Amino acid sequence: MAKKIEAYIKLQVAAGAANPSPPVGPALGQKGVNIMEFCKAFNARTEKFEKGMPIPVVITVYNDRSFTFETKTPPASFLLLKAVGLKSGSGRPNTQKVGTIKRSAVQEIAETKAADMTGADIEAMTRSIEGTARSMGLVVED
């Protein structure tokens, strides 16, 4: 008989930096999951990413308190800011622009995010990432 799923927990944890402190500890502790086991497995799986990069993770908790987890690609906003070398986007994106990004760089980000996005094709995903860039106060140029 298959294990029954008790809960899904969605978190954003820095790559290689999962530890029992909030937000990881309380979220997993409520469901009775072994926190240190998750932290060790997550840190091992995210070694290939740049340390400190936020990694979305979906943890599936089963009724016997075991778990599995799936890591996603970093958020598009983080990848865009990293590409232009900024710490944060604009507080007023329509009036205050904070940087420019090439369309080719946006397409690279869309290709990186393709596994997690539900776009019909790479062009649609690129347009979606361009919209994210504009909402952050970045100008997309050819």
Curated annotation (Swiss-Prot):
NCBIfam families from the UniProt entry: L11_bact (TIGR01632)
Protein role: Forms part of the ribosomal stalk which helps the ribosome interact with GTP-bound translation factors.
Keywords (A to Z) from UniProt: Methylation, Ribonucleoprotein, Ribosomal protein, RNA-binding, rRNA-binding
Protein's name according to its UniProt entry: Large ribosomal subunit protein uL11
Description of post-translational modifications: One or more lysine residues are methylated.
PROSITE patterns: RIBOSOMAL_L11
Quaternary organization: Part of the ribosomal stalk of the 50S ribosomal subunit. Interacts with L10 and the large rRNA to form the base of the stalk. L10 forms an elongated spine to which L12 dimers bind in a sequential fashion forming a multimeric L10(L12)X complex.
HAMAP family in the cross-refs: Ribosomal_uL11
Family: Belongs to the universal ribosomal protein uL11 family.
Gene coding for it: rplK
GO biological process: translation
PANTHER family per the UniProt record, alphabetical: 60S RIBOSOMAL PROTEIN L12, LARGE RIBOSOMAL SUBUNIT PROTEIN UL11M
GO molecular function: large ribosomal subunit rRNA binding; structural constituent of ribosome
Organism: Shewanella frigidimarina (strain NCIMB 400)
Pfam families the record matches: Ribosomal_L11 (PF00298), Ribosomal_L11_N (PF03946)
GO cellular component: cytosolic large ribosomal subunit
